[in-house]
Regions:
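Domain-level signature for proteins that mediate thiol-based redox and metal-cofactor handling
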Residues: 1-171
Length: 171
């Protein structure tokens, strides 16, 4: 599937690929992720983002999607059919143990931040995920009334992400 980010393509599977969210910025980060490692072997793959039943791939500008999309789809399909785990069990356990929606932990979160997290989870995250990305609450500054979030996957570096995020929150 195309995403709003022209450098990212989203590949959706009809079954679970990973039970948690994983973002790999390079092959070194993918040492326990056989699927991501395989994708990074291609010279045009810049980043790999996996969540539930999809893989979002960010490419370098050295190739056009029309030239590489079928090859990527086939690699993902063959990997899925092999029955291998996309990410090793140790990494899955480690990722599941992390707080899924925020960089903050329990007692550090004030009531306003909790409300913001709830809004992000219920209204923003599903829309962002449908575009092949993720949003994670980072902080809220009560003095300036500014919310800081981290965009991952297709949303990271997307030229329209600021507008889309602002528009989505306001609506």
């Amino acid at each position: 599937e195309n995403t709003p980010n022209p450098a990212v393509m989203k590949y959706v599977a009809n079954k679970l690929i990973v039970p948690a969210l994983f973002e790999f910025k390079n092959i070194d980060e993918a040492k326990d992720a056989p699927l991501a490692k395989k994708l990074f072997m291609l010279p045009f793959v810049k980043e790999v983002f996996m969540d539930q039943n999809y893989v979002s791939i960010t490419k370098y500008d050295v190739a056009e999607w029309e030239e590489v999309s079928s090859e990527l789809r086939e690699i993902i399909r063959e990997f899925m059919m092999s029955g291998k785990e996309a990410v090793g069990a140790a990494s899955v356990q480690k990722e599941k143990a992390k707080a899924p929606t925020t960089l903050l932990h329990g007692s550090e979160i004030d009531d306003t931040s909790k409300q913001i997290i709830d809004i992000l989870e219920e209204h923003v995250k599903p829309a962002v995920a449908s575009d092949g990305g993720n949003i994670m609450f980072e902080s809220y500054d009560s003095e300036t009334k500014k919310v800081h979030v981290i965009l991952q996957g297709a949303c990271s570096g997307c030229p329209s992400s600021t507008f889309t995020l602002k528009n989505g929150i306001e609506n």
